[in-house]
Amino acid sequence: MIIDTHAHIGALPPFFDMTTEQVLRSMDKYGVDFTLVSSIEAAEFDHQSNPVPDFLQKPQNRVLRDTLDAVRQAPDRLGALPWLKINQELPDAEFIRTVREYRSLIYGFKLHPFHSLTAPDDERLEPVYALAEELGLPIVSHTGGCEQAMSVHLYNAAKRHPSIDFVMVHMDLGTDNKAALDLLGTLPNLYGDTTWVPVSTTVEAIRRYGSKKMLFGTDNPIDGPDTLLHNKTGERSLYQQYFHELRELLSTAEYSDLMYKNAQRIFHIK
């Protein structure tokens, strides 16, 4: 079994156009059983830290509804991770009401400090964490790429909220992962994921802390419908190493924890 805890839907011209159909076809082709998705249409800043133009901005409640509409197409295969616009908006009454109404489709909240230029330990996010704690939902956050997104800020939030599970997506993207790897073992409610993380880092995390701390995630279909096979230039995808070579480096139990059992436990996926 494979659970992908980090995939995307939504369009952000001219960079991304990722559809629910792409995710489902990819799951069929590469043997992924369940996928958690968030919508990139909640991005507030682009990769150059420029505000996303107003005509491309969507209100948080619309992004939430669109995400729920997507996972309703296949609720036995897709789950929602609503992406929060933490720079410009906080959960309002409509957002909270919708989340409660469709709680069965929602498996956590997604933060993207890089695309929001807001750190997870910013005190303005306390209402987000209060809602997550009330509903028993984990927090999944991009790490890496700018100061606000570095893993230490998610660590600070996790330390302040020991009853909430926090996942460091990317383990500090674009780095040697050392800082995130060191933080991973410091709190029982802090986890990492494999999205663009070298296999060697994942193996080291399991060697240090056991097999319960890392989750399988991919960013699918960020490089197109065959993200799990090759990148945009046709080079073999990192995830082929996770599907094949990594099996030889871990025990069966360790591999199962990484690829689906940890996700089942943390996100309460049945």
Predicted regions and their residues:
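Divalent metal-binding pocket/active-site signature
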Residues: 85-90, 97, 101-179
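H/E-rich (His + Asp/Glu) clusters that bind or coordinate divalent metals
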Residues: 165, 172-270
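Residue-level detector of anion-binding/catalytic polar loops
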Residues: 33, 137-138, 191
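Active-site neighborhood of phospho(di)ester-bond hydrolases with catalytic His/Asp-centered motifs
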Residues: 2-5, 36-39, 81-83, 110, ...
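Short amphipathic alpha-helical segments and helix-helix/interface helices
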Residues: 23-24, 67-71, 96-99, 125-129, ...
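Mid-domain alpha/beta scaffold segments of enzyme catalytic cores
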Residues: 1-117, 123, 232, 240-241, ...
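Proline-centered flexible-loop/turn and helix-kink motifs
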Residues: 75-76, 104, 162-163, 188, ...
